[in-house]
Every structure is written in C-alpha cells, then in structure tokens.
Amino acid sequence: MAAMSTLLSLVAPLCLLQSVEYRSPAGVEYRSQRDTGAIARAESALAADPRNVDRIIALGVAQSGVRQYREAIATFTRGLGLAPNNALLYRWRGHRYLSTRQFDKAMDDLQRGAKLDSTIYGIWYHLGIVQFVRRDFRGAADAFTRALPISPDSAERAGSTDWLWMSLSRAGRKADAQALLDRRPDTPNAGNAYAQRLRLYRGEVSPDSVFTPADTSDIQVATLSYGIGNWYLVRGDSAKARSWFERSVASGGWPAFGLIVSEIELRRK
C-alpha cells in the first residue's frame, strides 16, 4: 500500500503538467507530453526580447513539439497581437487549430496567411489538409498543387505528392491522379511513411507489405493505416477501408493527419 501511495504521488504531478489537449469523439482524452527543456529555453530567450516575433514562433514550435497545441495557439495569438500581418504566425496557428480539430478557425488562418504571402509551403500544405478534412477534394487538390513545387525537401515532396494523389482520386480525377504517379515528383525517395504509401499507390508493394518492422510509433501507424484505408476506399472496398481507419484511430497518434481524417471517415454513414 505504501509503495502504491508513493507511485501515485509521483504520477499525479505529471498528469497535472500534461494537460488535456483533445477529447476524441469516443471520449478519449489525449494529453500533451513532458517538456524536456526546449520550452524552458524558448521562454528564456523570449523573456530577453518579448516583442521578438521570431522568438514567439520558436516558443510556439517548442510547445508543439511536446503536443502542447492549445498553449501554442495562445503563443501564436500573442504574436499576432504584435504583428497582425505576419503570414508565418497564421501558418503556425492554423496548423495547430487543425491539430485540435478546430477546422473552421484553421481554414480562416491559413486562407488569411495565403493572402499575405503565397510563397509559404506550410500554408498551402496545411490548407490542403483542412480542405480534405472538409471533403472539399477539389479545393484540396488545388492547395497541394500549389504546395508541391515549393516543397522544401524530399520528405515534404513525398507528403505533398501523396495528399495530391488522394485528393485527385477522391475528386474523381483518376486519370490526373495516375499521371501524377507516373511523373514521380517525389523522386528521390524520402524513406518516410508517405514514400511507403506512394509505393502502394504505384503497385510496387501490396497492402500487407506497406508496414515494416520499424513502423511502431503512434504517428507512423496512424499515417500508414489511413493511407492504406483510403487506397481501399478509392478502389471501392469500404469494408476494408473502415478497418484500416479504425486501426489508425486505435494507434493513439492523435496529432497525425491520418488519424484526424480517419475520425472523419468513421463518422460517415
């Protein structure tokens, strides 16, 4: 009994520090993670120059790194109070509204950011995700078409290519989706979850071979599972699609875009 009391005394403060960031449609509470020092360092840097927008963004990014998304939203909002026309602040706050399933607010921020600066990759990419979530697949395809040429690295090129293929497919533009795969804009291979999904779309691997032994993190499982489920869905197999969407949600990787969209898919009749 004494040992149990000691354990509870250690765990309880951690629960208080790790705030509830999101409650799923099933009532599951998802919490932030513990800060390992990045937030403290960012706060210290900001304290030395509290009106420095770059340092405000750095603090919000550090908070996001441990899934403190609601805290990050407050930080970016603080920045917008100082710099109301800063497109990057809208990019980051819109992203975190998306993470916390505040889709209308995410759309507003990302659209405003795009009007302020149309050259920021992260604005178009996350705007595409929001439009996909809202089932505006044509709008999502347009956003990912804008994102793809300005992708900063191979990992982001794979992500943009993947979401563009899914958006075109769901919009009924199957020929354009196939032409995209044939063009291979994601080359060289990034070696991430999106690259693995693209191999499935191209017929290079079977659905049962998409996962590797290394794919164990919650985000990776959520991402791969949604991609496989959507692949089945566009091929007309809604039963298998649903089972993969359920696997995505069960992964617990709640910030993953795949899990966010899986929740939406599972609410459809």
Positions of PLM-derived features:
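Canonical positions in the second alpha-helix
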Residues: 44-45, 78-79, 112-113, 146-147, ...
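Register position in tetratricopeptide repeats
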Residues: 65-66, 99-100, 133-134, 166, ...
